[in-house]
Amino acid sequence: VAFYVLAHSIITRASQPIKIIPINKDMLPEYTRGKDDGSTAFTYTRFLTPFLSGYVGQSLFLDADMLCLCDITEVLEYTSTSTDDVFVVKHNYTPKEGKKFLGNIQHVYPKKNWSSMMVFNNFAQACRRLTPEVVNTASGKYLHQFEWSSDERIGELPPEWNHLVGEYAPNPDAKIVHYTLGTPCFAGYEDQEFATEWFAERERMLAHD
């Protein structure tokens, strides 16, 4: 349900037509990577975004456990004139909890959560390195720590574009909310920051069905 709530929050606030495509490994014959390190396919398939976009234009990747509270075209306009390879919020934090929802282990590593929200410049040579072959074989470190790019070519977005609920101090001006510990639909997370907004969005979505 989290994906549909996020998609609804994007579409209803966008000032221009937006195409939203879920990345589903079962619909990606190019993705052949096995569970070699215990990670899920979603850990890696996000890096196929430039390939799936034909290495043309800009593409925005978002984790599904988010909520958009702004016109999403703002972030694309913010990055449109840059030649950087990719734009992210450059989080620098240590997770407060050792586990996430459903008991999942909270791994700690450099550039953690940078890849949860990425604006790709698909024309960039670095993005063209993200071929199915590379995504199928490269290490998680190579992908998630942006070794396919370089630090000076990773553009920085303001923190309100990927506000980590439960990790950062409350921010009423957050534009994209990230329920990184667990979405409000999970027990124990229904009273967290921006939970009311998430449930309201879900109700508006269901009312349109």
PLM regions and their residue ranges:
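N-terminal anchoring/stem segment of glycosyltransferases
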Residues: 1-45, 52-55, 196-209
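Short, well-ordered loop/turn elements at secondary-structure boundaries
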Residues: 55-56, 82, 112-114, 150-151, ...
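Short, surface-exposed amphipathic charged segments that create phosphate/polyanion-binding patches used
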Residues: 33-40, 100-105, 171-174
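Conserved catalytic core of nucleotide-sugar-dependent glycosyltransferases
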Residues: 78-143
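GT-A fold catalytic core of metal-dependent nucleotide-sugar glycosyltransferases
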Residues: 45-95, 119
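A short acidic, often aromatic-flanked loop/helix-cap motif at beta-alpha or helix-coil junctions
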Residues: 26-31, 94-96, 162-166
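A glycosyltransferase accessory/donor-loop signature
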Residues: 16, 22-24, 117-209
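A general structural signal for short secondary-structure junctions and capping/turn motifs
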Residues: 51, 76-79, 107-110, 145-149, ...
